[in-house]
Design a protein with these regions (language model features):
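Thiol-/selenol-based redox modules, centered on thioredoxin-like
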Residues: 131-168
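Short, internal strand/loop/helix patches
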Residues: 99-132
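Bacterial N-terminal signal peptides that target proteins for export
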Residues: 1-9
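Sec/Tat signal peptide C-region and signal peptidase I cleavage site
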Residues: 19-23
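Structural microenvironment flanking redox-active thiols in thiol-disulfide oxidoreductases
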Residues: 63-102, 117-120
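A short beta-strand-turn-helix
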Residues: 27-49
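Aromatic-flanked redox-active Cys/Sec active sites in thiol-based oxidoreductases
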Residues: 52-58, 85
Length: 168
């Protein structure tokens, strides 16, 4: 009996340790709730930033994500922020897995974490009805260019080339 308990305890501790290692090895998306837009905006103020809204439930988004991964590999200086803006909050593990498959694991990642997603969209842009994908090109001076739908990455590259280089 004692041997069974010790074995069960060892197996349990092994599973806990393995799960802990997995969590430490993979960055989870930051929960995007009320006030997150203001925080994200202030953290990137004064720095050219590409903010890409996508979703696990958006077919064109999933097809497009590997292209963003290639662009990030090509332009490691690009400040890319990804926001999973699904109407219903998605599992952080599913979001993370999709980003890893697309080569975007090193990009800053957020995920809508409020079931009242209309409120989150309104904080971002009162005129945005929630269509995905959507990309915002935010210049150092705060001026913003919105690219609705699948982004033309040639346009994004051209915009990046026109931005002043700044330290991360």
């Amino acid at each position: 009996m004692r041997r069974t308990i010790v074995t069960a305890l060892a197996l349990t501790l092994g599973l806990v340790a393995a799960t802990g290692l997995r969590a430490a090895d993979t960055a989870q998306p930051i929960p995007f709730g009320r006030g997150s837009w203001a925080k994200l905006w202030s953290e990137h103020a004064g720095k050219p930033t590409v903010i890409h809204f996508w979703g696990l439930t958006c077919g064109p988004c999933i097809v497009e994500m590997p292209k963003w991964g290639k662009l990030l590999a090509e332009r490691p200086d690009m400040r890319l922020v990804l926001v999973a803006a699904d109407p219903l909050p998605q599992s952080p593990d599913r979001v993370n897995d999709a980003l890893q498959r697309a080569g975007l694991e090193r990009a800053e990642s957020w995920a809508f974490a409020d079931r009242f997603y209309e409120r989150l969209r309104y904080e971002i842009d009162p005129a945005w009805s929630g269509e995905l994908p959507r990309t915002l090109l935010v210049a150092a001076d705060g001026s913003t260019t919105a690219l609705p739908g699948v982004a033309d990455l040639a346009t994004v590259r051209k915009w990046l080339d026109a931005q002043p280089r700044s330290p991360n």
